[in-house]
A protein has these predicted regions:
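Cytoplasmic helix-loop-helix junction between adjacent transmembrane helices
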Residues: 105-145
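Helix-loop-helix hairpin linking two adjacent transmembrane segments in secondary transporters
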Residues: 140-187
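Structural signature of the two symmetry-related core transmembrane helices
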Residues: 78-93, 284-299
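Helix-breaking motifs and short loop linkers at transmembrane-helix boundaries and internal kinks
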Residues: 43, 75, 96-101, 303-304
């Protein structure tokens, strides 16, 4: 029987977890507009700057399954405290990195320790009744969007690239402060929520992967996810270098650009996507989002001024914001109830791999081909992704 005290504890834990998510993503987003200029201060070429992004994603790719299993074994609370506090120290290490190679190491360690998204999701699910989980996960998505909206603006305001690497220490310390505040909030306010582990054999991960890739909707959805995430991550990694080359931008301008795009993304995810899906269905909205991304990529490549480029960036953000919820929904709808977590986890790993390769490839295109080549290549790759989305449009009713 429910009592006011447990309900109050549940609400408090929910608020703290959402605050932790916001602070974590704000710290992550705070660093994004700084990395290209931080790398340049270390005399790194474009391809090495791109690796600064990929190193984090590679660490996160390895950290997600490790910390997820660890949270099942020792509990959510200790894993969250260790990973969040350790991630804060990784920002401090990055602030004092004297070479690009030590910066790579700091980013990798930070990414590994930030592989706690599944632990946060598990903690949120632990304290939420099944019938309320969808709405609470929506709140989690809003916290992500809000953190990514605020973080880049703060980073751009605090950075002083004219001072070399010293000019990036204050924003990196701010990111570390966000992390330490999150860890303290977990230590003080969050109670252990892990349920007793269930006994019994589980299907091998390779078998779950094989069945997922054999499904016509899931397989196509994962391919589209990989293409779009790799393209967007590559653009994200080289956007600072491209806008500096094209328009003479610095961290402040880039930070405010990401903030504006974050506002648009939050609106699209929180309000617009649901309305579009209710009216047209996920496959049609997914296809429209891919077309918008394709248009935006070309628009940016051909843009004569930054005003036009931002219109193109808005199209890309709009398309990406309505694509990913539809992809997740389609994959979830095609997955048996007892394999939701495993299958969606496989797609998360798939997207993490895309975030590793996308920035490296885009960095090579920037250095060896053309500063805006990543826009063109991503637009080309979106065309087969759109064809796959049209196939899902035909297959979804019978395959799901």
């Amino acid at each position: 029987m429910s009592t006011p005290a447990p309900l109050q504890d549940e609400r408090r834990a929910l608020v703290v977890l959402l605050s932790v998510i916001f602070l974590n993503i704000a710290g992550f987003g705070l660093v994004i507009p700084l990395l290209p200029f931080f790398g340049k201060a270390l005399d790194a070429p474009a391809w090495q700057i791109a690796i600064l992004f990929s190193a984090y994603s590679f660490g996160q790719f390895l950290g997600e399954p490790f910390w997820g299993r660890m949270s099942d074994r020792v509990g959510r609370r200790p894993v969250l405290m260790v990973t969040i506090a350790g991630g804060a120290l990784a920002y401090v290490a990055l602030a004092f990195a004297p070479t690009i190679w030590l910066a790579f190491a700091a980013r990798f360690v930070g990414g590994f320790l930030s592989g706690n998204i599944s632990t946060l999701q598990g903690a949120l699910a632990d304290i939420t009744r099944p019938e309320e989980r969808a709405s609470k996960m929506g709140l989690m998505g809003s916290a992500f969007s809000l953190g990514f909206m605020i973080g880049p603006a703060i980073g751009g305001l605090l950075a002083h690239p004219e001072l070399g690497t010293l000019g990036f220490q204050i924003p990196l310390f701010a990111a570390a402060g966000f992390g330490l505040a999150s860890a303290l909030a977990v230590a003080v306010f969050v109670r252990e929520s892990r349920p007793e582990p269930k006994s019994g054999p589980r299907a091998p991960q390779i078998e779950v992967l094989r069945q997922a890739l054999a499904h016509p909707v899931i397989a196509r959805g994962m391919i589209i996810s990989f293409i779009t995430v790799a393209g967007f991550a590559g653009i994200e990694a080289t956007y600072g270098l491209w806008t500096e080359h094209r328009f003479g931008w610095g961290p402040r301008e880039i930070g405010f650009a990401f903030m504006g795009i974050g506002v648009l993304g939050a609106y699209c995810q929180a309000i617009l996507t649901g309305r579009l899906v209710r009216r047209h269905g996920e496959p049609k909205v997914l296809t429209a989002g891919l077309v918008a991304m394709w248009f935006g990529m070309g628009f940016q490549f051909l843009s004569p001024t930054w005003h036009v480029a931002m219109i193109g960036f808005a199209f890309v953000c709009f398309g990406q914001s309505i694509c990913f919820p539809c992809l997740t929904a389609l994959i979830s709808q095609a997955t048996p109830p007892d394999r939701q977590g495993e299958t969606l986890g496989i797609n998360m790993s798939n997207m993490a791999l895309a975030r590793i390769g996308g920035p490296v490839f885009a960095g090579q295109l920037f250095s060896l081909v053309n500063p805006g080549a990543a826009f063109v290549v991503t637009a080309i790759l979106i065309m087969p992704a759109t064809a796959l989305a049209l196939q899902i449009l035909r297959k979804a009713p019978s395959a799901a």
